[in-house]
Structure formats: structure tokens, C-alpha cells
């Protein structure tokens, strides 16, 4: 990469407030012209230039990211322990993108995607471009071909751990093979997706390794390249189980934005994952609306525009699932309050 060159220059201290503002504006504009918009963050922790967003299908996550969804033209990493809900988070984005008329490719390197489950979440399997590569190199070839078209809004890669280099499959095992492949591929890919505004979600796992004096350390496969090139990294954590009597019907899931280059990081929204149905949009929207004052709560009863929605959060979910017009009105008003389109 060509390194920026600096010409010799003179400096002086500015005292006039207006001169300072103008000088700062010129400096930030110069930097963004050379290195791209969104390089500079404003006082609210948001990129100084508008970043287009691809809705995640989870409103509270859109809020946590800060711009209304995943930033377009960027790499995203979803990582967490086994069965934490990573694939479900990704599939919610697939369904939302398709609902909005977008095109999606799903790279199933693990050969484990349950199509029926994906359809339950709203994924249209008949219009989903689905691929199952044998090697990491094959996967990246497919990704690059999809990006090259400029037609895809979202590409999901499931998962990084399954992107095994061809040489390793052939029996030639050397330390750092996968990390080297990831570094080489991602360094070339990051600029291309910025041009096509494609979002690529990489699903990754947390693994425990022994380090130091037998200390247990958690890490993610694939080396450090994905951590570096991702604009947003989200850790998916399982939480409290949701029960209906003695039956466990779901669980609470925390989505922790451990890295965020388009807004402030370290947000931790908690969402409800209903087994078989995914994250409840009704509960998610109502919870967000309650925080904004769009929905009112008196005791156990929730209300919207003077109309009772139900008793308890699951009562509200039941009501809204049978009254889509009320849900759509609530969803739209909540997004307006958040200044999301």
C-alpha cells in the first residue's frame, strides 16, 4: 500500500473560534478525500459522513450499531460459542434483506444450514443463492465472483472455522495456513465490497486455548485479519432460558458490539430467541418502543396510542402477531423516533 506523503509545512496557534472551526473542517475534509468517508467520527461517535445501512432484522441491534443496521460496503463478524444463536442472527438479516427486495448469497462452508429452519425465519430459499465450497480458496473465489457482479446486497459466510485451506485438506499441515489465507483474501476483498456496497457477514466461533500457566483463553479461528478488517464485530452470547411452564421455549441472547467503526461500540442489547422461530421482532420492537416512550406500560399491561396491546410481553407478542397492521404502525413510529428510515 502506498504510504501517505507529507510536505513540509509551517504551523501556528489559532485563537479565534471561527478560524479553528474552519481549519478543523478543512483538515477533516482533506483526510476523508484521501482515505474515504467515515474515517472521521463526530462528537456523537458517528461517522461524519452518512453511512448507508442494511437492516439486520433486529431493531435493537440496528440501534446498537447506531446507523440503523449493518454498514453497507463493510465486513461484519458475528462470533460466539456453539449454539449461541450466531446463524440465527445472520438469517434474520437474510430474511430482512430479501423482504426489502435485496439479493443474498449464502456460503455454507460447514454444510450445515437447515433450510426448513431458515424458511421459518422468513428466508425465501427459492431466491437465495446457496453454495457449499470444499475449501477456503473455493469459498473466497465464490465470494469474489459474487462481489464482482455488484448485484448482491448481502453475503453470509458460515463459518470461518470451516474455511480450510486446500493444502491442509491434502494433508500438508503447516502452522498459520488459514490465518495467512484469510489475511491475503480479506486485504483484497475489503476495498471491493466498499465499491459495490455489499455487506459480508462472517460467522465465527469462540474456541478455548491453553496459554501461559495452563490458563484458559478464548480466541476465534482464522487469525487476526478478520478482527482488523471488520467494521463491526458482534459477540453473540446465550443467556437466561425462557420457559412456558416446565418447557423451555427459548432463551435470552445478548448481542455485544465489541467493535464498531461507524458509531460508539460496547452496546449490549438483549433479545428473545424463540426456538424454531428465531428472534421475536414483536418483543424486540415493543421493548425498544417502551424505552422511547412510544409504548406505555402500567403494571403488566402494555398500550400503544391508547390501545391495550396485552398483558405481559408474551401477551403483547401474541396480540401483535395476529394484528400486523398495529405492529407495522408501531414499528414505523418507533423507527421514526430513532430517525431510521
UniProtKB/Swiss-Prot annotation:
GO cellular component: cytosol
Residues reported in the UniProt entry to bind ATP: 80-87
PROSITE patterns membership: RECA_1, RECA_2, RECA_3
GO biological process, one term: DNA repair
Pfam families (alphabetical): RecA, RecA_C
Keyword NAD: no
Name of the molecule in the record: Protein RecA, plasmid
Species, as recorded: Lactococcus lactis subsp. lactis
